[in-house]
């Protein structure tokens, strides 16, 4: 082997093999492009994105690390999400979870977890946003 030489496998590398995935339709209802990175907690993505946030809770994009998905205003696409791995503890982002995604484990309980709920203050603002193809006076894309 020479310094800097690459030795490649015969078969392609399959990322996230065996991880259960969910597909969601996402629409950017805002007036600016939105980019979401590979390891961002997708349920906490920009409020101008219209999708089922409850279904995305605890998930990230099923794309290679360090990459992102970009949605232009008015774009509708389908994304594939996989569960966050590791300890499944989330801090930061939009401050929705700030702790374990599996509350029963954090509390040391063995009972089934209650269905996690997204606080109303974090629900999508997309329902309030106009179609980017139709301008409405007084619209701004700021969070409330």
Curated annotation (Swiss-Prot):
Keywords noted in UniProt: Cytoplasm, Hydrolase
One GO molecular-function entry: urease activity
Keyword Hydrolase: yes
Region annotated Disordered, chain positions: 110-144
Catalytic reaction annotation: urea + 2 H2O + H(+) = hydrogencarbonate + 2 NH4(+)
Stretches with biased composition (Basic and acidic residues): 133-144
InterPro entries: Urease_beta-like, Urease_betasu_sf, Urease_subunit
GO cellular component: urease complex
Compartment list: Cytoplasm
Subunit text: Heterotrimer of UreA (gamma), UreB (beta) and UreC (alpha) subunits. Three heterotrimers associate to form the active enzyme.
Family under the similarity heading: Belongs to the urease beta subunit family.
Name of the protein this chain belongs to: Urease subunit beta
Higher taxonomy: Bacteria, Bacillati, Actinomycetota, Actinomycetes, Micrococcales
């Amino acid at each position: 082997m020479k310094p800097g030489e690459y030795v490649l496998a015969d078969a392609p590398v399959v990322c996230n093999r065996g991880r259960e995935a969910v597909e969601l339709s996402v629409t950017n209802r805002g007036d600016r492009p939105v980019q979401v990175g590979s390891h961002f907690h997708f349920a906490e993505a920009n409020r101008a994105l219209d999708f089922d946030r409850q279904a995305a809770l605890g998930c990230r994009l099923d794309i290679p690390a360090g990459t992102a998905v970009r949605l232009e205003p008015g774009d509708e696409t389908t994304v594939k999400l996989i569960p966050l791995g590791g300890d499944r503890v989330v801090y930061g982002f939009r401050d929705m979870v700030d702790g374990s995604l599996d509350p029963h484990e954090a509390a040391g309980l063995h009972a089934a977890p209650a269905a996690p709920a997204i606080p109303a203050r974090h629900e999508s603002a997309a329902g309030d946003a106009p179609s980017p193809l139709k301008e409405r006076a007084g619209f701004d894309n700021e969070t409330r």
